[in-house]
Amino acid sequence: DETAAAAHEYTETHGCTFVHPYDDLVTMAGQGTLADEVVMSGEGPFDRAYVAIGGGGLAASVACWLKKFWPHIKVIGVEGIDQASMKTSIEQGRRVNLDYVDVFCDGTAVHIPGELTYPLCRELVDEFVTVTNNEVCQAIRAMWESSRVVPEPSGAMSLAGFLKQWNRGEVKPEEKSFVVISGANMDFTHLTQIARQAGIGNHETRYLRTVSYTHLRAHETSLHLV
């Protein structure tokens, strides 16, 4: 919100055009092309889709696109437990401006939903789930261990929502789900905190194949995470 205010001030001072990051139909149309790629991939249809919510632009556009092709898909919006402005607003029937917003997942730290995104999410998002920072850290760890990818906290939020519902038994084994993981702007200073919260200190064995270019031979090395 503070960034948006500063951007508005800059555009007025310098005669620029302000492009809203989520509360704009053209912006949302562009974000929705992500879902077009999913549909055109031929991997569907899917039963569930998990999308992180900040201002709501990505969730609204993805939900709109998916339901056009797969009307029965269930779209689950995922918010941080101390960032749930959209969930709170829909529960209260009006746009709510939160007094406090946690900024660990800084890419989704929004005090109040957009004027355009709020009614769209109310209409198109079927369910909302909130996740803790620790659950987000666990999701980042899962991404690293499975794909060697490190998403930013906001980018991993949707995966945290899926894992939470999966662990609760709310996702049926036969259901086909996809998760939107968007964002790799990791603050390097967060890595230690994420590793600590995700329990990286567990004693687990990993195998790494390294190549010695001096002796031109490969060595198998057993790594222990401590």
Where are the regions that the model predicts?
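PLP-dependent amino-acid enzyme catalytic core
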Residues: 1-213, 226
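Conserved small/polar residues in nucleotide/adenosyl-binding loops
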Residues: 214-221
